Amino acid sequence: MKKYVSYAFVVLGAVCWGFIGVFNRLLASAGVDMQNRVFVRNFPSFVLLTLVFALFRREVFHVKPRDLPIFMGSGLLSILTLSWVYFNCQMECSLAVAAVLLYLAPSLVVLMSALLWKTPVTRRKIAALLLSLLGCALVSGVVGGALTGSPRGLLFGLASAFCYATYTIFAHYGLARYDTYTMIYWTFFFAGLGSLAFLDWAALAPALATAKGVGGAAGLVLVATVLPYLFYTKGLEGVEGGRAAIIANVEPMAAALLGVVLFHERLSIWVLLGIVCVLGGVALLAKEETPHGEA
């Protein structure tokens, strides 16, 4: 029973991440510009995590100074920069396109791991990379019709995949020394402080005085940032990491469905095939982590 509860936590986390685009667009309609949306996601999340951990898990505040560069990298590149490029992508492309481009990240992790740790690049990994690249071509409109996003938006999407992939690299080093909650807290410590550089209070204050602004900000922080990280982390206590990664790929599905339901976005057969290809590539990579998955 405990195992199924852990699976449910992972699914909840992934579905919550799928709401990022919804609240991002709500903030945009309230007049919150891109710079301030980066601040709204990261700084309040840092403050909220600080309060939660101060009450329930104070040990996360204790790390060795020599390990701070790990958290600086994950916070400033993997979270803060990711927020900026991903939000830009979502404004230039459909939510489905933005989500699927983001999920090219596992393929990039394979390449980075091979370069950094000499991890073997097997036939299965090559097949997964090709599937992901085909999926990218399909969902972006390079294959099968007109582009479903601007070239600028597609570049932002690829950049978001790179930033997302770097979190796995930094986490490899961070989790070798600390638990998951400590990794999350210090990542958002630097992401939150770094996001102050994006704050334009004179422009943000009027937007936050509206119902749309408050609702969008609260949703982005609680539903699309803090809760998914806490749910996903809780789920990892009872689910093997590779399986959790596969389950978490319901995020692009959730984002696509939310785009259809809330924004009346159209899912062509090519976009659907692209989603299948990208997720198929991720599934191949995760399967290789099992004892019977070598190829």
Language model regions located:
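Membrane-interface helix termini and inter-helical loops of multi-pass transporters
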Residues: 22-34, 60-61, 91, 140-152, ...
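Specific transmembrane alpha-helical segments of multi-pass solute transporters/efflux pumps
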Residues: 21, 50-96, 138, 221-239
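Loop-to-transmembrane-helix transition segments
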Residues: 5-15, 40, 60-85, 151-160, ...
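Small-residue-rich packing faces within the transmembrane alpha-helices of Major Facilitator Superfamily
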Residues: 18, 43-47, 133, 189-193, ...
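Hydrophobic transmembrane alpha-helices of multi-pass small-molecule transport proteins
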Residues: 49, 72, 121-142, 195, ...
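Glycine-/small-residue-enriched transmembrane alpha-helix faces in small-molecule transporters
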Residues: 1-40, 146-173, 293-295
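C-terminal transmembrane-helix exit sites in multi-pass transporters
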Residues: 48, 53, 86, 105-130, ...
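Helix-helix packing/entry segments at the starts of transmembrane helices
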Residues: 8, 40, 79, 83, ...
